[in-house]
Swiss-Prot record:
InterPro entries: CHCH (IPR010625), NDUFA8 (IPR016680)
Coiled-coil stretches: none
Motif (Cx10C motif): 94-105
BP GO annotations: mitochondrial electron transport, NADH to ubiquinone
Motif range (Cx9C motif 1): 31-41
Organism expressing this protein natively: Arabidopsis thaliana (Mouse-ear cress)
Name of the protein this chain belongs to: NADH dehydrogenase [ubiquinone] 1 alpha subcomplex subunit 8-A
Length: 108
């Protein structure tokens, strides 16, 4: 398995920093309800145990999204993730790959 791979051999997402950074805009849009529910829970209850299920909801959403993105645009996602990995998550150096990724897998 390559260090810059977005998924493992079985097609499950590998949430490395490069994968998460490359997918951050999509995560922010698609998983907003889960993230907001988790943040609201954390704000309202200082007991971490009370928010574990909300945290699992966020994780489930992100992993599902990563799998979906990789199924819909594997070549573009792998190129963008590979660039982000190579350049240590420097967006400015990966704009060409980002544009290709967002063209095939648009933000919605």
């Amino acid at each position: 398995m390559e260090a810059n791979a977005a998924v493992d051999g079985t097609g499950n997402p590998i949430p490395t920093s490069a994968v998460l950074t490359a997918s951050a805009k999509h995560i922010g849009i698609r998983c907003m309800p889960e993230n907001m529910a988790f943040l609201k829970c954390k704000k309202n209850d200082p007991n971490p145990e009370k928010c574990l299920e909300k945290g699992r909801d966020v994780t489930r959403c992100v992993l599902g999204l990563l799998k979906d993105l990789h199924q819909r645009c594997p070549k573009e996602m792998d190129a963008y993730v590979g660039c982000m990995y190579y350049y240590t998550n420097e967006f400015e150096l990966c704009r060409k790959e980002q544009e290709a990724f967002e063209k095939v897998c648009p933000l919605k």
